[in-house]
Amino acid sequence: MTDVTAPVGVLDSGLGGLSVLRALRQRLPHEDFLYCADCGNAPWGDKSVQWVTERCDEIAHFLVSVHGVKALVLACNTATAAAADHLRTWMPIPVIGIEPAVKPAVQISRTHCVGVLATAGTIASPRYQSLLTRFADGADVISVGAPGLMECVERGEFETPATLSLIRRYVEPMLKKGIDTLVLGCTHYPFLTQALRCVVGPDVTILEPGDAVAAVAETRLADTAGLKAAGCGRELFYIRDSEKHETVLRVLWPAARKETVLELPF
């Protein structure tokens, strides 16, 4: 039987998964969340599938054996593509992954031309290619790997000239091809929404995945009788190289306090 008081684990390569944690907190106000960010090894998007899978395994074992989490949210597209299926083979709890919102983007696009910004690892993965096969439905889906954007978020450079220049490099070719919908295929990218909006203008719809992931998490917890129905939920953060990243963490999650930010011990 699920212990409803147990925390929910949230795993990401860095701080971008806080965009998913934000959606989880809004939908599940009573839950305690334990957020693990492997900032010291980020980015994961250019690492091998084997490396990402082994690292996710290591963090997942820590969350289950030390903290007894009742569910695990992979708040990272690269981690989902590389490791979700493997983690589900041994974890005795729900494992909720994240995927680029190709299906809803195709459904709402008026021009039948959709852009996807993601990491190279996500775009090259069989899981993403399967997503396109199932849901592109004849639309022109322009997939662009965007190295450097994740690092902009990790450094707290959300709207600097350098960040805007990088965004233009990736997005302007999509705009010339006629996209009217842009899918953010990395959980870091929602923190660049204002900068992205400056480049794409007011008429392009920007889709981020946090709300959909939170809805799935709520359903899976309900299915396992794991929903916590009362109390004020708390967050605890395990960050690799926490001192280096604590300032940006506090910008992205102002409620974080020094005593709730711990060093990921491996």
What are these regions (language model features)?
Residues 1-266:
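Non-catalytic structural scaffold of enzyme domains
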